[in-house]
A protein has these predicted regions:
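Structural signature of the two symmetry-related core transmembrane helices
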Residues: 106-121
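Small-residue (Gly/Pro/Ala) motifs that create kinks and tight helix-helix packing interfaces
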Residues: 1, 5, 62, 94, ...
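Extracytoplasmic gate region of multi-pass secondary transporters
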Residues: 38-94, 182
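Intracellular juxtamembrane helix-capping segments at the cytosolic ends
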Residues: 144-159
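Hydrophobic core of transmembrane alpha-helices in multi-pass small-molecule transporters
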Residues: 130-144
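Flexible cytoplasmic inter-helical loops of multi-pass small-molecule transporters
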Residues: 7-30, 224-229
Length: 229
């Protein structure tokens, strides 16, 4: 599908719109003001923390289930595969709900609470029912916030398409680094201490940034003006 779009898609742009919306390069000062905005920093931290845990679990849970919970690799892989499967429906819900209720911090707080509760259950509990329930809830929490994450930058004051692109690039860069780092971190911790659990816990705590971002977002979007002298 992506290859077909790349080869066949053609932009539909009116000549009048091209003349009225010139593309201007951003200065370093403008770029810095965009990426240092408190709301943008919260978005970056939230997505990076969630993906730190998500990538660690999807990379290592099958091996963990096999070595620690005495499951077959195929069963461990099936259980882990529920995470992205549930995410398909969660991200759709995450796109529909804000369109009805607006871009509200609750769409960070609620998924953040799901992640805080369900994350540890995927590896600390040996009960199969708890594991399945934790995987499903974690899958919802790890994807429900994504549409709001990508839409919120467009609602920030003074944003232009160029600035929104900078924000998205910043988010993707940091999140990509977290996705690269987390499996290495869990693997290194396992080699040193002989257990996956400490690495999973570290990555799980990092995912709490989503809940923290939801709590702090109202203040970042509406900063209190400094008192006059």
């Amino acid at each position: 599908g992506a290859l077909t779009w790349t080869l066949l898609a053609r932009p539909v742009v009116k000549a009048s719109s091209l003349a009225s919306t010139p593309v201007t390069a951003l200065t370093r000062k403008e770029i810095w003001s965009v990426i240092s905005h408190p709301a943008v920093l919260l978005l970056v931290a939230a997505d990076g923390g969630v993906l730190l845990q998500y990538t660690a679990l999807t990379s290592w849970l099958p091996t963990f289930f096999n070595e620690v919970r005495d499951m077959s690799l195929s069963r461990g892989g099936f259980i882990t595969g529920i995470l992205p499967f549930v995410g398909v429906f969660a991200v759709l819900a995450g796109g529909i709900l804000p369109s009805r209720f607006g871009l509200k911090p609750i769409f960070f707080v609620a998924p953040g609470m799901l992640i805080v509760v369900a994350g540890p259950g995927t590896f600390l509990s040996g009960n199969l029912i708890v594991i399945y329930a934790s995987i499903v809830v974690l899958g919802i929490g790890s994807w429900l916030y994504v549409p709001t994450l990508l839409s919120l930058p467009m609602a920030l004051p003074g944003m232009t398409p160029e600035k929104v692109g900078i924000v998205w690039g910043f988010i993707i860069t940091v999140s990509g680094f977290c996705m690269f780092l987390s499996p290495l971190l869990v693997g290194a911790v396992r080699d040193i201490w002989g257990s996956f659990t400490p690495g999973f816990i570290v990555c799980g705590v990092a995912a709490w940034t989503l809940l923290l971002a939801g709590i702090l977002m109202p203040r970042a979007l509406n900063p209190t003006p400094a008192p006059g002298r």
